[in-house]
Amino acid sequence: MKYTLEIQKLLLQAQNKNLHPREKANLLKEAIRIADENEDVEWATEMRLDLIYELNLLSADTEEIAVFSKILDDYENHKDVIKEDDLLWKYKWIWSSTFDIPEIPMEQVEAVGEDYKTRILRNGYSLRSYYQRWSVECTWMRQYDKAKEYIDKMLAEKMDDQSCEACELNFMLDYYLETGKFDEAYSRAQPLINKQVTCYEANLRAYLKLAYYAQKAGKPDIAADMCTRAEEALAGREKDEYLLLYMGLFIAYYLMTNPERGWEYAERCIDWSLRTNTLKKYRFSCDMVEALKYEMRPEVHLALPE
């Protein structure tokens, strides 16, 4: 079948590691279009799941949700070729994305969460990932008592294939760091620091925020160690714009210790902030307000996008 060769050619191009996620997304969209034209629902679904990964790197939440809605529609109409279980990991991402879009009312966010909950239960999973997501949201909203309740509920559930131990631990650090429990956070972070548990971004995110909070806690040696680890992990990830959410406090750390390096990162991140979603733009702005407290010079000169 000629169309399969066309798709394979596009997918081969998308494997180029030098491509920006936006370029990969465009190649996947074209491949999906061809699959749809030829009514290859199974292959189109696989590629849409891959597309969601690339869109996630671009913080393209609204588009992610639209793509996943199509996947769910196809699942309902083609349960003979699409397994619901194969969709649930990305569904967790999509539910997370709904929290980040102010235009989506909380009632709808909760409804998506309940639907996700129903689907994971009927596929034999625990509620661990469901409670974990709520713990993250409550921490971000500074509802720390509720966050701790959800953390406790999460830990009481069994670990399964909908869970990521490294990501869970990374997000738990936010609760302990933001409530002033640095020593406990640092102790709990050891599996991430020593790479006993790993994930694509969880270890790096831990280094970034621990550098800032260690410096604030009067522990410069720990802060310097976390900074070194972060710099090593950031090498080669200059295109990972989704890291914006975690870079602001790292910039703040550098403005306390090495302002020139901090502003180098700021130049990169300000460019990213012009293309990201509303939540990340807001949180980066808040972190930069914090960072500016440590810049003593009345004026700095930056190379910014036009």
Set out the residue ranges of the language-model regions.
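C-terminal non-catalytic interaction modules
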Residues: 273-306
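Alpha-solenoid helical repeat scaffolds
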Residues: 118-128, 132-133, 142-187, 196
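TPR/TPR-like alpha-solenoid repeats
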Residues: 54-55, 137, 175, 213, ...
